[in-house]
């Protein structure tokens, strides 16, 4: 099996080689850095399932297997402690940021305000895939969705969930708010989300989740129309300061879907 490589032009590279070259190994390894991923417009995924899922939605540029690379070379290119033996290099996808005009009935969007941890972002993407949220809007200081750790944590969900980065999340939220869509935010002074009136019957809207340490930024907080709280149990008893943001996201999305199913 030959190394698949299309449209990417690298020096001293013979695409007809049956075995991966040193230049290719070095190039794939360099894609662990965001700078090089952005310059080339590509990203790396590992593992048979993840690669197979992603090739349904992304253009596969390079497919590396034990047939065309040694275990040492795969280890050099891998970002995992225990390489899975299959590596794919994909071209990034250009998706249009959703607008109020194209938001379908029953469609929810998720907005992430400064999520820093790649593992959290990857888990959130995977959670959105489970709960039928297919667009995530991120501030530019949110972790890169093409970071190898994020891609790995999504377990292939990146093939079905579109992740968008915007220069101004407040500006985008204003557009949705003006169009009459609710903007939900998880805040410590929010309303217990398990109270029936906390989540309106209108299913359209944007759910905002904030930074791991600081929560939702002040500029975004001002645009939240429905403040929600995930209560501790028993309510109002001393407990941990906060939930992990990926766990909190899963709880919120599960409750939205539960209430929507109950009302429909």
Question: Can you say where each PLM-predicted feature lies in the sequence?
Answer:
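Boundary-proximal intrinsically disordered activation/regulatory segments immediately upstream
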Residues: 7-64
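Short pre-catalytic strand/loop immediately N-terminal to key active-site residues, enriched for Gly-Thr
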Residues: 41, 112-116, 233-241
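Methionine residue identity
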Residues: 1-6
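Active-site/ligand-binding-proximal alpha/beta "capping" segment
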Residues: 185-240
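RNA substrate-binding interface of SAM-dependent RNA methyltransferases
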Residues: 101-190
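Glycine/small-residue-rich loop that forms an oxyanion/phosphate-binding "nest" at active or ligand-binding sites
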Residues: 72-90
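Structured adenosyl-cofactor binding patch, chiefly the S-adenosyl-L-methionine
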Residues: 130, 145, 152-157, 218, ...
């Amino acid at each position: 099996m030959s190394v698949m490589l299309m449209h990417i032009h690298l020096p001293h590279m013979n695409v007809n080689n049956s075995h991966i070259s040193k230049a290719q190994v070095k190039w794939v390894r360099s894609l662990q850095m965001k700078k090089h991923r952005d310059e080339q417009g590509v990203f790396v995924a590992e593992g048979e399932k993840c690669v197979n899922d992603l090739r349904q939605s992304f253009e596969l540029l390079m497919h590396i297997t034990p047939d065309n690379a040694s275990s040492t070379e795969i280890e050099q290119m891998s970002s995992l402690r225990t390489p899975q033996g299959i590596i794919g290099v994909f071209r990034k996808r250009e998706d249009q940021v959703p607008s109020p005009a194209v938001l379908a009935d029953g469609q929810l969007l998720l907005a992430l305000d400064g999520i820093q941890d790649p593992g959290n972002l990857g888990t959130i993407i995977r959670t959105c895939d489970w709960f039928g949220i297919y667009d995530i809007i991120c501030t530019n200081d949110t972790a890169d969705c093409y970071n190898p750790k994020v891609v790995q944590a999504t377990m292939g969900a990146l093939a079905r969930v579109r992740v968008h980065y915007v220069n101004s999340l407040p500006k985008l939220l204003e557009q949705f708010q003006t169009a009459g869509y609710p903007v939900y935010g998880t805040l410590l002074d929010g309303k217990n989300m398990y109270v029936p009136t906390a989540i309106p019957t209108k299913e359209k809207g944007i759910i905002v989740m904030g930074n791991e340490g600081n929560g939702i930024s002040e500029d975004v907080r001002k645009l939240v129309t429905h403040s929600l709280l995930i209560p501790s149990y028993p309510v109002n008893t001393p407990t941990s300061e906060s939930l992990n943001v990926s766990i909190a996201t899963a709880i919120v999305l599960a409750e939205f879907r539960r209430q929507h199913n109950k009302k429909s």
